Amino acid sequence: MAKFTVLNHPLIQHKLTIIRNKNTGTKVFREVANEIAELMVYEITRDLAMEDVEVETPMGPAIEKQLSGKKLAVVPILRAGLGMVDGVLELIPAAKVGHIGMYRDEKTLQPHEYFVKLPTDIDQRQLFIVDPMLATGGSAIMAIDALKKRGATSMRLVVLVAAPEGVKAVQEAHPDVDIYAAGLDDGLNEEGYIYPGLGDAGDRLFGTK
């Protein structure tokens, strides 16, 4: 079964409170969402593989550490996932960026894929799939399906807020994909939105309704 982890770092929790607040405007919401994403990926990458390498310092040779595992990529689920990309790239500027476009039918709550654009070497990269909300889990499951179909084998799902229903659904569909969240909420309301949540993340990120 996939691991589910809530990252309880004080800075992450403080910033999550800011974006939950309905009075937080678009500019601050966007900035803080990226800050949370950066902090989350910092925590999540603690287990990246390392190797010894010899470097020449101004004073002489030294044996130091460098990354040795798979190259990294971030894959936002459009459109709201775009609001976490800059935070990840701030920490890992060499990461490539793929995109998966999804929209949710407001009546059936089912996701529909409309766009996929990925690095050509996706099978050689560790992917961070980013989306602010994990509600029913439908979009995340479909995104992971699409990535696996195209050769991806190493993925982690990174969300700001999750509902238990979505966590359970993703774990059952993809037990090999670990899930990381800044917050775990009570559940879904009758419309399928996370409660108490933070509202519509896409609208709050981009100033739309």
UniProtKB/Swiss-Prot annotation:
Cofactor list = Mg(2+)
The catalytic activity of this protein is classed by the Enzyme Commission as 2.4.2.9
Primary enzyme class: transferase
- Binding annotation for uracil: I194, G199, D200, A201
The answer to whether the entry has keyword Magnesium is: yes
Q: Cite the entry's keywords alphabetically.
A: Allosteric enzyme, Glycosyltransferase, GTP-binding, Magnesium, Nucleotide-binding, Transferase
Q: How might one describe the regulation of this protein's activity?
A: Allosterically activated by GTP.
Keyword Nucleotide-binding set for record: yes
Q: Which SUPFAM superfamilies match?
A: PRTase-like
Q: How is the cofactor bound?
A: Binds 1 Mg(2+) ion per subunit. The magnesium is bound as Mg-PRPP.
UniProt-recorded Gene Ontology molecular function terms: GTP binding; magnesium ion binding; uracil phosphoribosyltransferase activity
So what does this thing catalyse? UMP + diphosphate = 5-phospho-alpha-D-ribose 1-diphosphate + uracil
Q: In which pathway does it act?
A: Pyrimidine metabolism; UMP biosynthesis via salvage pathway; UMP from uracil: step 1/1
- The entry's 5-phospho-alpha-D-ribose 1-diphosphate-binding residues are R79, R104, D131, P132, M133, L134, A135, T136, G137, G138, S139, D200
Gene Ontology biological-process annotations = UMP salvage; uracil salvage
* UniProt similarity note: Belongs to the UPRTase family.
Cited function: Catalyzes the conversion of uracil and 5-phospho-alpha-D-ribose 1-diphosphate (PRPP) to UMP and diphosphate.
Entry-linked HAMAP family: Upp_B
Q: What is this protein called?
A: Uracil phosphoribosyltransferase
The gene behind this protein is upp
